[in-house]
């Protein structure tokens, strides 16, 4: 029996990793969860949690899957980056999605907007391999079930937490006005790193109005399915929503395109949403072309390809390609944070 580990730092990891977990179980293998921050309250019955470094080392997984940018290098197993979203060029010129930190053995890419660039980086660095698998979270999307528009239009508002890009301070008054004046239902959800003050402000709005709901949880897929239109700024949830063949209105998107209705003033939000609710044919055609460029897979088997990639890497490349960089400072920093020093006594993790 093969054993795998999920390395989790934020609650957005659940819908990314659970499809992989389902495929692991389908194959008769085992998987456990390890958390670096307190978000284990969303674990479900039957899901296994390892709480200490000692337990992880004794569990001895063959692979560690991380949706985030970091992973403990001293954990057993090949380190697999499965990403927490799509590349949307949120901060043009930064290239955050393609940053190589020397921590991962495998990058599981999504499609033509990410794979070619990572293959170039593979040639440059030579200490990891790239596999185009599609994104595991999209396994939850398919097969798509055609959905009629809601009798009362339903608007999902989601925003990035990134300072200077988030729309939350700028759109609150307009969203509050629309919620009071328009016969629309509002669903609101934010990134786990969103400012607590902002979260509290929008929660109060939801508590005050019957047609506004604030969602905090481990899986936003139901929200994506339920809404007719997404209102956003520059977040990868845009691409997730577009998979459902529905339009997006953005406020000052950092990389606007013909697949979005982008506006630069809160006063333009209302007419933009009204236009989006008509599902204009040209816009919908552009959405479908854009989504195909990000991920061509619609078969619900991205998680299976990810596990196959791990098997292929272990069989062909483990121990045979260039070693990852020493990263001594980062390793010492991590060891100090978790009070584990693998170059000393084997088990020195704090309780």
Language-model segments: what does each one mean?
Residues 43-54, 76-85, 204-214, 246, ...:
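Active-site regions of enzymes building and remodeling cell-envelope glycoconjugates
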Residues 1-4, 153:
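Extreme N-terminal starter segment of soluble prokaryotic enzymes
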Residues 5-144:
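Active-site and donor-binding regions of nucleotide-sugar-utilizing enzymes
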Residues 13-27, 131-202, 298, 302-304:
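Conserved catalytic-core segment of nucleotide-activated headgroup transferases in glycan assembly
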Residues 69-70, 75-83, 217-260:
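A donor-sugar binding/catalytic signature common to diverse glycosyltransferases
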């Amino acid at each position: 029996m093969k054993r795998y580990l999920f390395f989790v730092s934020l609650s957005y990891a659940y819908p990314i990793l659970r499809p992989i977990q389902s495929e692991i179980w389908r194959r008769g293998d085992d998987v456990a969860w390890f958390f670096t921050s307190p978000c284990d309250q969303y674990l479900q019955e039957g899901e296994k949690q390892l709480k200490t470094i000692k337990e992880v080392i004794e569990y001895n997984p063959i692979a560690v899957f991380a949706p985030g940018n970091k992973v403990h290098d001293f954990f057993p197993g090949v380190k697999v980056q499965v990403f927490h979203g799509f590349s949307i060029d949120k901060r043009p010129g930064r290239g955050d999605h393609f940053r190589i930190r020397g921590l991962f053995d495998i990058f599981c890419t999504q499609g033509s907007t990410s794979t070619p660039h990572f293959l170039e980086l593979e040639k440059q660095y030579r200490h990891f391999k790239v596999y185009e698998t599609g994104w595991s979270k999209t396994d939850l999307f398919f097969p798509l079930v055609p959905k009629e528009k809601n009798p009362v239009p339903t608007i999902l508002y989601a925003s990035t937490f990134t300072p200077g890009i988030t729309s939350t301070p700028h759109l609150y008054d307009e969203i509050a006005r629309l919620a009071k004046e328009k016969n629309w239902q509002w669903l609101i959800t934010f990134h786990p790193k969103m400012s607590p003050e902002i979260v509290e402000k929008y929660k109060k709005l939801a508590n005050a109005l019957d047609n506004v709901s604030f969602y905090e949880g481990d899986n936003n897929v139901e929200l994506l399915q339920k809404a007719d239109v997404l209102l956003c700024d520059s977040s990868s949830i845009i691409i997730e929503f577009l998979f459902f063949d529905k339009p997006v209105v953005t406020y000052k998107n950092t990389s606007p395109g013909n697949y979005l209705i982008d506006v630069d003033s809160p006063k333009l939000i209302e007419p933009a949403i009204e236009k989006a609710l008509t599902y204009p044919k040209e816009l919908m055609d552009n959405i479908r072309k854009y989504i195909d460029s990000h991920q061509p897979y619609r078969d619900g088997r991205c998680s299976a390809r990810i596990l196959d990639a791990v098997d292929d890497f272990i069989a062909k490349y483990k121990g045979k390609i260039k070693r990852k960089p020493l990263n001594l400072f980062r390793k010492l920093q991590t060891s100090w944070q978790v009070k584990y020093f693998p170059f000393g006594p084997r088990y020195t993790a704090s309780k």
